[in-house]
Amino acid sequence: MIIARKKLQLQRLWRQRGCRVATYICLGVLVLFGFVYNSKGNSMSSIKSDSAAQQFDDLDDLTNKELPGGPDPNTIFRGSELGNYEPKEPEIPSNQPGEHGKPVPVTDEEGMAAGRAAEKEFGFNTYVSDMISMNRTIPDIRPEECKHWDYPEKLPTVSVVVVFHNEGWTPLLRTVHSVLLRSPPELIEQVVMVDDDSDKPHLKEKLDKYVTRFNGKVIVVRTEQREGLINARSIGAKHSTGEVVLFLDAHCEVNTNWLPPLLAPIKRNRKVMTVPVIDGIDSNSWEYRSVYGSPNAHHSGIFEWGLLYKETQITERETAHRKHNSQPFRSPTHAGGLFAINRLWFKELGYYDEGLQIWGGEQYELSFKIWQCGGGIVFVPCSHVGHVYRSHMPYSFGKFSGKPVISINMMRVVKTWMDDYSKYYLTREPQATNVNPGDISAQLALRDKLQCKSFKWYMENVAYDVLKSYPMLPPNDVWGEARNPATGKCLDRMGGIPGPMGATGCHGYGGNQLIRLNVQGQMAQGEWCLTANGIRIQANHCVKGTVNGFWSYDRKTKQIIHSQKRQCITVSESGSEVTLQTCTEDNERQKFVWKEFYQSS
């Protein structure tokens, strides 16, 4: 009865003209909406097709609340089969020294003298390098699994940017040769060599003539004045036409099948930056070897509060989603020298901050910017690149000589990206408090434009393992030069690690004489802690995860006291040695006056 009554009411309602008109209108709207939605879907499909044509999937890992840089389903492990980009034939060694990355010994006096002269001029032994083939073979020290990965057939093209200033001839050109020798030719758009105002004759007309053999694949761009590594890299990126810009230092050798593993994560998400494993090339013998010992030992990049680069084991959280030890993994930061990044993404990020000079701090500026602005950084175990570590810096900072360039750079990074966490940098580097970072308004505007996240978000979601090794620093109680008026000497770490603390003439430049003593009793110089070892004070690595100690400063007696030993730091009568002795208030060699030292820009 109820159903019949409802049916009769509906029939009466339908007979009313207004109701019928309203129904027809609703049906029409639904049909029109369906047509528009379908057209929009087709339009979106077209956009996706265009994106695919650019070789980027541009997937957003954050749709699943995942950080960018997770496992790539399009990179497939083939088990016992060789991967699709693995070389089919081994490289043929030359009959020159140094093949297979072996060291080249020099024992004659004339050769050793030539090596010393070369090292003084270039920071490494180019005398030995000149004996070695440009196309020498090097050992494949990748993890065994790396030989069995398939990468997408369509990978983005690459512009390799190599910046140099007064570089040695063969190390520079061996870098270029190795890239062209060990890369799929269809992926190398160009090699861009950026000459940062070199004045050595071999880097002028001779170099221009040499690169013509590469038939336009290698170009030389010259700066009009000394720009420094950071700005010169941005210049190189602006001259690049490849979809990805890949930066190498000017003294590298790339290893077997190094390139596809770097490109696959970028293809999946264009906002991911990739970093190869860096192997070592000895600056004297030119031996190629692993830095980490085992090829299966992987580390991610972190930092301590003075913004010194450190490495640590991969976190359990990051390991959990990796089925294979050879898969890429996320890293909070990177060492700065070697990496690949989508060219247009790099441009959106403003390249490097134009206010950063020469070198120093750029790896943090880029790392913080990438992570906080929606991108990610991954280390790639299957991509290996050898790098020569110089014995010393063989050239000056040019017009920036005498300026605290690195401190200025760091302050720009700190003030732009670290928010309230900047206080920990200034606790670690108090002398930089008054350093003027220059105008950072453009960087702050970029951060606002890109809607970048806070540094607190970065520390909690990306760099969460930093605090395990490097906790937030308590305030300094006293810091600066600790001068003993009786001798006129200042406490000095003396440079040895481990090594005893001494006392030397106060020079006013900070360095080994810039001591910090925090409110929890830890005394340190730079990243080194000063601890009691018998009656001596020893400089050594700080115990990771600690910020406390046994030191205190008595402002009344002016003594530096070790509470556990109940002894005071004492300068010897000769004024050079420092020991712990029984505290005596009238002992003038136990009194210290602290003078804070500030850098100026």
Swiss-Prot record:
Glycan attachment residues as annotated in the record: 135
Major subcellular site: Golgi
Enzyme class: transferase
Top-level taxon of the source organism: Eukaryota
Domain (Ricin B-type lectin) ranges: 477-595
Chain intervals for the UniProt region annotation (Disordered): 61-108
Catalytic subdomain A, as annotated region: 155-265
Cytoplasmic membrane side: 1-20
InterPro entries hit by this protein: GalNAc-T (IPR045885), Glyco_trans_2-like (IPR001173), Nucleotide-diphossugar_trans (IPR029044), Ricin_B-like_lectins (IPR035992), Ricin_B_lectin (IPR000772)
Binding residue positions for substrate: 196, 226, 359, 390, 395
GO molecular function list: carbohydrate binding; metal ion binding; polypeptide N-acetylgalactosaminyltransferase activity
Annotated transmembrane regions: 21-38
Residue segments, region Catalytic subdomain B: 328-390
Pathway named in the protein's UniProt entry: Protein modification; protein glycosylation
Entry keyword annotation includes Repressor: no
Cystine residue pairs: 146-382, 373-452, 490-506, 529-542, 568-583
Subcellular location as annotated: Golgi apparatus membrane
Lumenal side: 39-601
Pfam families the record matches: Glycos_transf_2, Ricin_B_lectin
EC number: 2.4.1.-
Cofactor: Mn(2+)
Entry comment, domain topic: There are two conserved domains in the glycosyltransferase region: the N-terminal domain (domain A, also called GT1 motif), which is probably involved in manganese coordination and substrate binding and the C-terminal domain (domain B, also called Gal/GalNAc-T motif), which is probably involved in catalytic reaction and UDP-Gal binding. The ricin B-type lectin domain binds to GalNAc and contributes to the glycopeptide specificity.
Protein family (similarity comment): Belongs to the glycosyltransferase 2 family. GalNAc-T subfamily.
This protein's name: Probable N-acetylgalactosaminyltransferase 7
